[in-house]
């Protein structure tokens, strides 16, 4: 009685078939002609990570272009051009009623909060009109009735002290100071104008990230190409 004769024969036959399949590439002959083998060097794990890093940097730069273009560049380009003039402080006032605002900065400052509304009235030397002064164009878009809007709500006493410090500064500054107004109307007089620095920062950093990612991917491809050429040269020398 031979219970294991059939499996042994199957195993031997399978082994002969595998030997026959592996013997063909090893012989290097197909229809009498030698096989042309094109070696393909596998990329290392470090090269794969570097390539992924470069692609991620390029993708993030495109996202930065989109976000900065819609949130900063678009309002800046659509805003009317401003001309420089001189302003003289007439009087300052802190409204009795605090205003509600949704603070969106990071950390514990997120959420709803209130802040004191500081109003600074100045005399515009260009037209002689009494107008409301704002810190910058963002303050006009956020709340055109106040000089500025705090970035974070923080402590109530801290917000009030900050508003009082700014009020005291304008009360003691009786001279004239430069300001910027819109020729379209007396509204929207700002203390600080957003200039070409905004455009520079919105374009420079995403472009730098894009070029850095492309440089990393290009260096990885160049390294792989040089390695492949080196292996071909070594194969020719050994032959």
From Swiss-Prot:
Region described as Disordered: spans on this chain: 15-38
Membrane association type: Multi-pass membrane protein
Cytoplasmic topological segments: 1-51, 219-239
Key words of the record: Disulfide bond, Glycoprotein, Ion channel, Ion transport, Membrane, Transmembrane, Transmembrane helix, Transport
InterPro entries xref list: K_chnl_Ca-activ_BK_bsu (IPR003930)
Pfam families, per database record: CaKB (PF03185)
Superkingdom of the organism of origin: Eukaryota
Sites where a glycan is attached: 86, 123, 174
GO biological process, one term: action potential
Residue ranges, Extracellular side: 73-197
GO cellular component: plasma membrane; voltage-gated potassium channel complex
Subcellular location: Membrane
Post-translation changes: N-glycosylated.
TM helices/strands, residue ranges: 52-72, 198-218
Subunit details: Interacts with KCNMA1 tetramer. There are probably 4 molecules of KCMNB3 per KCNMA1 tetramer.
Record text about domains: The extracellular domain forms gates to block ion permeation, providing a mechanism by which current can be rapidly diminished upon cellular repolarization.
Entry function: Regulatory subunit of the calcium activated potassium KCNMA1 (maxiK) channel. Modulates the calcium sensitivity and gating kinetics of KCNMA1, thereby contributing to KCNMA1 channel diversity. Alters the functional properties of the current expressed by the KCNMA1 channel. May partially inactivate the current of KCNBMA. Two or more subunits of KCNMB3 are required to block the KCNMA1 tetramer.
Family annotation (PANTHER family): CALCIUM-ACTIVATED POTASSIUM CHANNEL SUBUNIT BETA, CALCIUM-ACTIVATED POTASSIUM CHANNEL SUBUNIT BETA-3
Name of the protein described by the UniProt record: Calcium-activated potassium channel subunit beta-3
Organism of derivation: Rattus norvegicus (Rat)
Lineage per the UniProt record: Eukaryota, Metazoa, Chordata, Craniata, Vertebrata
Gene this chain is encoded by: Kcnmb3
């Amino acid at each position: 009685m031979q219970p294991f004769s059939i499996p042994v024969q199957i195993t031997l036959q399978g082994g002969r078939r595998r030997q026959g399949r592996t013997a063909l590439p090893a012989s290097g002959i197909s229809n009498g002609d030698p096989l042309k083998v094109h070696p393909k060097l596998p990329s290392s794990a470090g090269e794969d990570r570097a390539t992924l890093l470069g692609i991620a940097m390029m993708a993030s730069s495109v996202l930065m272009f989109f976000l900065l273009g819609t949130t900063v560049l678009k309002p800046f380009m659509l805003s009317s051009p401003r001309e420089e003039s001189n302003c003289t402080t007439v009087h300052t006032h802190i409204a009795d009623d605090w205003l509600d605002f949704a603070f969106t900065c990071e950390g514990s400052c997120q959420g709803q909060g209130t802040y004191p509304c500081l109003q600074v009235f100045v005399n515009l030397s260009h037209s002689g009109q009494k107008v409301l002064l704002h810190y910058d164009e963002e303050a006009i878009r956020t709340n055109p009735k106040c000089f500025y809007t705090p970035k974070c709500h923080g402590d109530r006493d801290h917000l009030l002290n900050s508003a009082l410090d700014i009020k005291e500064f304008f009360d003691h500054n009786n001279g004239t100071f430069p300001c910027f107004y819109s020729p379209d109307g007396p509204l929207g007089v700002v203390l600080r104008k957003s200039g070409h620095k905004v455009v520079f920062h919105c374009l420079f950093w995403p472009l730098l990230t894009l070029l850095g990612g492309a440089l990393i991917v290009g260096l990885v491809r160049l390294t792989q190409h040089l390695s492949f050429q080196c292996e071909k040269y070594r194969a020719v020398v050994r032959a």
